[in-house]
């Protein structure tokens, strides 16, 4: 799978936060998450 660009990654974070956590992320929270995961989708096989 290709890496997401930052804009797509941020939109996806917003979607997940709203749908799963029922929460809005602040810009700082989004930057922090992006700094950890970058644009890479999380691979569940690595656990």
Swiss-Prot record:
This is Putative uncharacterized protein MJ0820. One of its GO terms (molecular function) is ATP binding. Belongs to the archaeal ATPase family. InterPro entries: ATPase_dom.
